[in-house]
Amino acid sequence: MLAYLCGPIEFTEDGGRLWRRKLAPFLRDQLGHRVYDPAEDEMKNLTEEEAAHFREWKTTDLDRFRRTVRKIIAFDLDLIENKADYLICYWPSENAHSGGTSAELTVAHRKGIPVYLVTPIAIDQVSGWMLACSDQLFTSIEGLKEFLAARFAREKQTQLWK
């Protein structure tokens, strides 16, 4: 099983890394799942030069920036479409900003890939698009962990009886 960790990266204080770093060991060690963390994989399909400079190109060379980010978009969406078994999206606050998150949720939804949305904010403050793309909604990472542990424990038991 491959879990894709989805959520704001670009405009967050920690680059969207902290929650992912806390959750990934549970997914790997407790569930035995593989994890793709786009916040940690900065190289993706980029050259060393692109990885090192694409952020500065946003203000100095917009065409080069677009070409590079389009490679990232293709890489991430291809991974979701062709390899991910489920997405976990963490939306930290009503002030969060992200362009890629909604696209990733939409691709997963259209492909029938389960989307687990975790957000501590009131449901009326969550984008309707994001809610519609999600299959399960959680108010905490701990609630998600309980759900996943139960969900995949049943799957492991089913495999034992085959």
What positions do the PLM features span?
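Conserved catalytic or regulatory cores that recognize and/or transform ribose-phosphate-containing ligands
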Residues: 1-162
